[in-house]
Curated annotation (Swiss-Prot):
Induction: During erythroid cell maturation. This is Glutamine synthetase. It comes from Mus musculus (Mouse). Its EC number is 6.3.1.2, 2.3.1.225. ADP binds at residues 336-338. It is a lipid-anchor. It comes from the Eukaryota. Decamer; composed of two pentamers. Interacts with PALMD. Interacts with RHOJ. Interacts with BEST2; this interaction tethers a fraction of GLUL to the membrane, causing a decrease of cytosolic glutamine synthase (GS) activity and inhibits the chloride channel activity of BEST2 by affecting the gating at the aperture in the absence of intracellular glutamate. The modification N-acetylalanine is found at residue 2.
Amino acid sequence: MATSASSHLNKGIKQMYMSLPQGEKVQAMYIWVDGTGEGLRCKTRTLDCEPKCVEELPEWNFDGSSTFQSEGSNSDMYLHPVAMFRDPFRKDPNKLVLCEVFKYNRKPAETNLRHICKRIMDMVSNQHPWFGMEQEYTLMGTDGHPFGWPSNGFPGPQGPYYCGVGADKAYGRDIVEAHYRACLYAGVKITGTNAEVMPAQWEFQIGPCEGIRMGDHLWIARFILHRVCEDFGVIATFDPKPIPGNWNGAGCHTNFSTKAMREENGLKCIEEAIDKLSKRHQYHIRAYDPKGGLDNARRLTGFHETSNINDFSAGVANRGASIRIPRTVGQEKKGYFEDRRPSANCDPYAVTEAIVRTCLLNETGDEPFQYKN
């Protein structure tokens, strides 16, 4: 398995410089979603002092023609800080800064899905929507070969790898542990991790987060994962079906509840929400991966713990359904439900917005409603 050239550099030499004092200055790494709707970009600027809140961070700009977001003849785009985290790579007082992207005319960039999502979340803030997202990913070498797999073959069939322990079952745990601790340091609301069904496939969970914070925390968790993998010389892919054949795909199962669902007899509200979702299946399929459903078509086959992309289904403890109601929720008659359709490479802003539009704003039809300002 191939690893990157950078991972073979002497990290001790780098540490000699990273241990130098930086005075009162602060390094702020600005992070944004590029024009693919999946990739992340970043660049760093120096601040004179440590910012206490995101509002103290200055707006910045970048060359959108190099990120698939504009043409070269009019390439300046704006970075507007919206969320701030501690930097686990440079450590305190340095910061990671998540940004929204705006075009030259101050309109949101096409892949700035946070802007409208924030507006939708504000409309239902009195219902306190909570989300938890289960991010699956696969570790790969720089040659595109799964981490730890035989160079000219396949590992043993699925079965012993899910939550597995041992060198022959868990591939790349060092990366998982490093990512977990880095997220905790940064202030990302990471709540767990586990090895998944396919060897070299892992999952981490983010949440519960209310409203727009779900997307903010998941995007930063993804960024941290990419940076950790960069240090180890490997790649984390969110491809929903990285290996064709009899291997599990990768999803981003999304758990959702409102205050009413979490209270006594909330199961009635959960069932009402699921009924609304059943009547808008194709709208959600289009929102649940960056290619309008084409990526998920490779994953949602009705096999390997997935539903069929063309059919809506729901059930208690059923991992082959579109919507799963956890058994404990069915017993306690309150709690949350799990939408198992989102792909691993989904935009969390698109997913959470779609759920709120259908379940709380009672939208119907195949297109989102355009609300007046």
